[in-house]
Amino acid sequence: MSYAELQVTTHFSFLRGASSAQELFETAKALGIEALGVVDRNSLAGIVRALEASRATGLRLVIGCRLDLADGMSVLVYPTDRAAYSRLTRLITLGKSRGGKNNCLLHWDDVVAYTDGMIGILVPDLPDDLCGIQLRKMAELFGDRAYVSLCLRRRQNDQLRLHEISNLATRFKVRTVVTNDVLFHEPGRRQLQDIVTCIRTRTTIDEVGFERERHADRYLKPPEEMERLFPRYRQALARTMEIVRRCTFSLEELTYQYPEEAIVPGKDAQASLEHYVWQCVPDRYPEGLPPDVLKVVRHELDLIRTMKYAPYFLTVFSIVRYARSQGILCQGRGSAANSAVCYILGITSIDPSTNDLLFERFVSQERDEPPDIDVDFEHERREEVIQWIYRTYTREKAALCATVTRYRARGAIRDVGKALGLPEDVIKALSSGMWSWSEEVCDRNVRELNLNPDDRRLVLTLKLAQQLMGAPRHLGQHPGGFVLTHDRLDDLVPIEPATMKDRQIIEWDKDDVEALKFMKVDILALGMLTCMAKAFDLIREHKDRDLDLSKIEQEDSVTYAMIRKADTLGTFQIESRAQMAMLPRLKPRTFYDLVVQVAIVRPGPIQGDMVHPYLRRREGKEAVEYPTPELEAVLGKTLGVPLFQESAMRVAMVCAGFTGGEADQLRKSMATFKFTGGVSQFKDKLVSGMVRNGYAPEFAEKTFSQLEGFGSYGFPESHAASFALIAYASSYIKCHYPEAFCAALINSQPMGFYAPAQIVGDARAHGVEVRPVCINRSRWDCTLERIGNSDRHAVRLGFRQVKGLAVADAARVVAARMNNAFVSVDDMWRRSGVPSEALVQLAKADAFLPSLKLERRDALWAIKALRDEPLPLFAAAAEREMAAIAEQQEPGVALRQMTDGHNVIEDYSHTGLTLRQHPIAFLRKDLSVRNIITCAEAMNSRDGRWVYTAGLVLVRQKPGSAKGVMFITIEDETGPANLVVWPTLFEKRRRAVLGSSMMAINGRIQREGEVVHLVAQQLFDLSGDLTGLADRDEEFKLPAGRGDEFAHGSPGSSDTRDKSKPVVAPRDIFTPDLHIDTLKIKSRNFH
């Protein structure tokens, strides 16, 4: 008997289904099921994944949706044709617009308005009067397309329930059909389905009750089993295939039409594009197009005409032109940088006359895939561009792609642990010990946490968390992938409001969009562009020099000298530990060297064993041999090593006779070979083609192995060149305008590898004067202040560094002092009108010290004395009261000031950095007693020396290409030290590695040229040494007891000494205890 399961819920139902479409389709295929109807609740988010699973297995997909209505009625709907599908997507869009984010609010009247051409299956619970009313509605609306589900609930009198539903269906002339309401693909997933129910309902397995499924039967069953379960309803079983035959619609019928663009009057899109290209040529080539570039441009325009992509290029051109008109810094990157047309239009910045790029990497007639242009904008101004796109194309025709937020290790352990009722401290201990998103927790890790690995709930938590990893949690919004259409976008896919105001997203992510060959425009945010724009503004204001990315001096020798020394903290792309370690070895001297530098520190070249051969050849330690002149022409610039994706494509084209389209298919197959195994068909073609062209079989095999090794991670040369431009520009500004770079970098946070504390420390090491936050000098952003009469400038820290201070309050402070500086706390409070809480935050940040000379405690004491502003009605009384105050002035109080160590703690706690001594400096005497040397001494030691050093943990990195090796950067008062932690030590000392704020390391120095690492052999957590750092000062030899609140800095509590009763009751302002025992250093961890 043929049978189709028409009620299947995938895990794209978000915490309802417990299996993926791939698992469901593969299992259904093995069981002999003819087709699957995917009906996720009020959503089509997973339907493209279901289509791909259907293609992979050859099993028929029936597209559907379960509509759970506001009145409790549930109907499964299946569009029979393209028009009905569009009505379904509009219906879901309507419900999402009403319900808001993660909700869908639909009524029966909505179903009536939109379900023409759909098959409907009522999902009843009990055969009662309500069921009869619903069946009558179904019959009236759907007619011969109305069905009712017969599904076992495994309750008492289940067969009687089915019999009565069947009788009601006959009475209202609605046909019955068997469904199994599948939630998981095989019985073993029942426990996970219970857990996701607990997560969704925010309860525990002990309390979930009847919210969970009452039976374990919600898995796929073979047709024979379904026939055994429903022996009296053979016709209802057969109707499953009847519905499959009636539903002829497939997602492959969706035809995407790009929106019409504003074009030159009297010209079509292609002619308009060519008009703009030739119009923009003088901007890029004032002396005319070089002949070779002219040839490339004509080739590209011909291909664009053939592929009908002109509207897409016009769209991106319009967006970039708008951004530039608003002074928003932007630059295209990715494969689009291979295009001469994109360069001439100003979309990208890679000149094809100086860079040998490959257009087929971007657009290929054989590939028949839409182009993909990524444009980066300043991250603080990108929203202006996004809203312009919405205004220009309308919200009916424009929306962002979704991103699928999936469970990773920590999130899975947290949610599963809560669902199973584990104590919060156990959950925290387990999740905090995880590093990578796919990492498993072994028994030894559990024992290290002093937990019992045999505890049943703990074991079940780890097992189910592993099953949950990778499952969708919810939909988010793509950073900037826009889908634009000619007709209504909600005819193609449901649209829902995003969490962020004035944005909307489709239910599909970028992979879904690419699978259906929709075009998208990526409007991305890049923090370094924001930094560069702010740096240019500061330079223009204070240095009287008008700079932008195109006006920066190229090939500046001083800048490259700085780069070769790895003095690149804060710059773009070349600031990471791995990049800094590579710079002294690669020694970039030209822009192309920088392109190689950006690309070589990637998993691809490392896995393809290309880094060391390239470096040896560059240093002259290994000869470069090319079997043929053709190969030398392709790989000459990279010394015979195929470092880029374009290199792999050119080798295939020149040496093996591939066409441009075939070469790009080779690249794509390598990128997915781990998952699809599709690379083997190209291996034979590549090897045989190279042998046929005179290359030795061994050389051909070696070439393919290299390409295969880096294919999945290889970097496009065009992408590397785009990034190298910004890397060079940021390095140039850091080199020649370090104060502007420092201020701009802090003003653009959060971004990059390093926190403001390290940025400021690096700037000071380069001779930049950094001044503290000041109520009379600071603005919201960091600014530059002239040093005396010189042409040098200092960086003044801005109010943005004050934790807890609102932008609006900072703006009120700045506005109030425009004419006159503040002379006291009271003066500032009354003129600015900021709430007292803002004053407290400023006092904690020591912002009253630079101009008012008020230490933290003095400022907080003054804030405590502030009185409420009197109302006009009581002005006379207020005057009398003030006179009384004047007559009975409270005597001045001499507060005991904080120690230097205590001030450092407060600096870190309230501004994230300190301009005083480094915290480790206060511990140096004790560390020296333990034979712990400084980081500088360790990094200057000879190769092979054993050293013992310590510092604050700044950055932890564990790249996927490093085979489990972790790289850590620590810092003391003398500078940073770079650590290497092998996997065995990491597993032994996991808690110390992941949980330390301060760490001691015993290890051996590894020196290769100017690159120095400390290879750790032992690790110790010294975070406890930071406790009570306030006491580490000569002035604090005999610290007062904790009971002496005055000495310990607790202005929020009362003074127990006798005080005269004040004339006017002071206004109580809550001020937390200033004595923070532990310095908390927030490190940055990168995966």
Curated annotation (Swiss-Prot):
Major location (coarse) = cytoplasm
Q: Does the keyword Glycoprotein apply?
A: no
Q: Return the protein name.
A: Error-prone DNA polymerase 3
Q: Which Gene3D superfamilies match?
A: 1.10.150.870, Metal-dependent hydrolases
GO biological process terms on file: DNA repair; DNA replication
Gene name in the database record: dnaE2-3
Q: What does this protein do?
A: DNA polymerase involved in damage-induced mutagenesis and translesion synthesis (TLS). It is not the major replicative DNA polymerase.
Enzyme Commission number(s):
2.7.7.7
Single GO cellular component term:
cytoplasm
The record's subcellular location field reads: Cytoplasm
Species name for this entry? Answer: Agrobacterium fabrum (strain C58 / ATCC 33970) (Agrobacterium tumefaciens (strain C58))
One family from Pfam that matches here is HHH_6
So what does this thing catalyse? DNA(n) + a 2'-deoxyribonucleoside 5'-triphosphate = DNA(n+1) + diphosphate
InterPro entries hit by this protein: DNA_pol3_alpha_NTPase_dom, DNA_pol3_finger, DnaE2, DnaE2/DnaE/PolC, DNAPol_HHH, NA-bd_OB_tRNA, PHP_dom, Pol/His_phosphatase_N
- Which keywords are on file for this protein? Cytoplasm, DNA damage, DNA repair, DNA replication, DNA-directed DNA polymerase, Nucleotidyltransferase, Plasmid, Transferase
Q: Which EC class is the enzyme in?
A: transferase
GO MF annotations for this entry?
3'-5' exonuclease activity; DNA-directed DNA polymerase activity; nucleic acid binding
Q: Which HAMAP family match?
A: DNApol_error_prone
Task: State which residue ranges cross the membrane.
Answer: none
The UniProt annotation puts the region (Disordered) at 1040-1064
What the record says about family reads: Belongs to the DNA polymerase type-C family. DnaE2 subfamily.
